[in-house]
C-alpha cells in the first residue's frame, strides 16, 4: 500500500451515537490550552477531520474524538471533538465513548469497581467516573462544565410555523429548546426527517433573532443545535422525558445528547421544575437513555448556572487503521448535501 496520513481509530458508539476515537497518528498540536488546540486543528489541520469523518470513509452520523496530551496539570489526557461540520467545544456522547475506549484498550489503567480520571475538553476540565466489571466499562458518568440559560420564553417567527415560544441554553454547546407538543410533534421515530427540517428552520430563525456569547469565552457565539422536548413525567424525586436533538447540519442525535441534557437541566432548574440531586432520565427516539442530575448551583461569571452530571454507556464496535492512497482523487474526503437537512444560508457556515 502507498498510504499517507495514517491514523489508528477505534470505532465506538455511546447510546447509539457513533463516537470514533483517534488514538494514534496525531501526537500533539500547538496550543497552550485545549481550546487553542481545537482552534489550531480547525484552522490548520482540518484534513484530519475530513479524512476520518467524510465520505468515502465516514458518514453524516459519525463523530470523532482526537486524543491529545493535556495542557492542564489535573487532567490525564485531553481531546478535541469533531463532527462532519464543526468542532464542538464539548460533547457528552464523545466523553462516554472516549472514556470507554481509553479504559478498555488499556490507554488508561482500569480499576474495579470504579475508575476515576479527568479529561481536558476545549470547554474545560471534565471529571469522569466509570463503573467497571470484569474488564468492561459498564457505564460512564461525567461532571460537565457549568450550564445556564441565555434566553427564556422568547417569541420566534419561523418559516412554516409562525410564532413559537423558545428558550436558549448552554450545556457545553448552545441549544434552542422547543416544546415539541406545542408545535404538533409527538417525538416518534417516524418524525425523524420532519424534525430535522423543522429544527434547521428554527435554528436559522433563532440565530437571526437571538444573540448569545459565552460569559467566560467571547469566541463562543451563536446557536448550533435544536432540542425538541417532550413532556416531563415525575415519579417521586425521579423525572423522565423524551427528546430529539437536531445537530448541524440537520441530522438527529441517536442518543439523548449529553450537552443537550445539561442544557435542559439548566432550563428546568431555572423554572423550578427540578431540584439539586433529583434524577432526570432522558430518552431519545431510538429508546437510548441518559441518567443525569444537577450536582450544585454555581455562577459562571455573572450568569447563574448549574453543574450537572450525566451517565451513559458505550460499546467498542471496531478497530481501524485509516489512511489515504495519494492517487485517490476522493481520498481527502467529500460530502454531498443529500444526506443533510440544510437550513437556509447554512452551507457557508460549515467546513466542507
Please provide the spans of the model-predicted regions.
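A glycine-rich beta-to-alpha transition motif near the start of alpha/beta enzyme domains, typified by
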Residues: 1-169, 176-352
